[in-house]
Amino acid sequence: MKIIFEAPINSLSFGNVAVNLLREMWKKGIEVGLFPIGKPDASAYEIESEFGSWIQNSINNRFLVLDKDVPCIKLWHLNGSDNRKTEKQYLVTFYEASQPTFVEKKLAKLQTKTLFCGNYANDQFRNAGCDNAVPFLLGFDPSFHITGKKYLPERVHFGIMGKFEKRKHTAKIIQTWLEKYGNNPKYLLSCCVTNPFFSGEQMQQLISSTLGGQRYSNVNFLPYFQTNKEVNDFLNAIDIDLSGLSGAEGFGLPSFNATCLGKWSVVLNATAHKDWATADNSILVEPSGKIPIYDGVFFKENDMFNQGEIFDWSKESVFEAFEKAEVKVGTVNEEGIKTGQEFTYARTLDQILAAIQ
């Protein structure tokens, strides 16, 4: 089987997904013509030499595979999906908003098929008349593993990971946690929330604003992680993940990965979270309503992309979830580990290939 694969190879979420899909293509013996979006950089990942050589050969020989009859899988945003390498293009993408615009629907329909991560995103486009929309689900990154180390056994260690954004409720999560646990030495909150699209000065301003100009002895802001190994160590170090309180996700990889590593995640029962988070493997919080998605930076009102609302939650319901999660500290989330065994990238690739065939 031959496939053209157009995707970014970098340390961001799309790059992580791309590397995992490539690994499964390699295992299946698929002949791939790899067209990187942007400068390829796989230094964030521990890639075995044979697989690494295969990736490089797939880039070097991409024009040998290129043919109008070879299907192209493009892993990218709707914004920027209007060009194609071959006649049949299958866009693999993510969507966090709730009201597909005319332009987004036009671009989705332009593809042979548009594969949206998660049923929530797919339903938004199906209901808007995009009959070529198909859902798929991500898998658990096999490079993540349980280290078995003891990190801070004397403290209840909470963690939040993901770009600082309004739609992720980053500031609200931190402020809610501080209201309950701020300066209590029994508890620690570690935040890996650097947004690489902001300058260092902008990030400092966001953090200062979030903390209300106060100093807290039990909250840490960590630098942006450059490697998967650092992410793995972070997820192993925490007891309770709060990244799942995001109000709109294409999948929610940090909370999903933490869950699959046997940690306890407090998860908003909405959007793509509903595809993997259950009452058995997560501490679920029900939404209290919806609010506009617009932040004036990544989501701008009346723009051609990313319009609509995100889900919100009440502080009271999250306080209650914190307490439920505390009770589980020290116990392994066995159902979460089972989730990681069920959600594999082999299955993800099979779902994508099924859409092609």
Q: At which residue positions do the language-model features occur?
A:
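Donor nucleotide-sugar binding/catalytic pocket of nucleotide-sugar-dependent glycosyltransferases
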Residues: 112-126, 130-146
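Short hydrophobic beta-strand element within catalytic cores of glycosyltransferases
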Residues: 264-267, 283-285
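A charged, aromatic-enriched C-terminal amphipathic alpha-helix characteristic of glycosyltransferases
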Residues: 309-320, 326-356
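Nucleotide-activated donor-binding/catalytic signature segment of Leloir-type glycosyltransferases, i.e.
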Residues: 200-229
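Extended catalytic core of nucleotide-activated donor transferases of GT-like folds
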Residues: 4, 41-124, 230
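Acidic donor-binding loop of glycosyltransferase active sites
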Residues: 233-250, 263
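Conserved donor-binding/catalytic core segment of Leloir-type glycosyltransferases
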Residues: 150-168, 174-177, 189-191
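Acidic anion/phosphate-binding donor-loop and adjacent secondary structure
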Residues: 102-103, 139-156
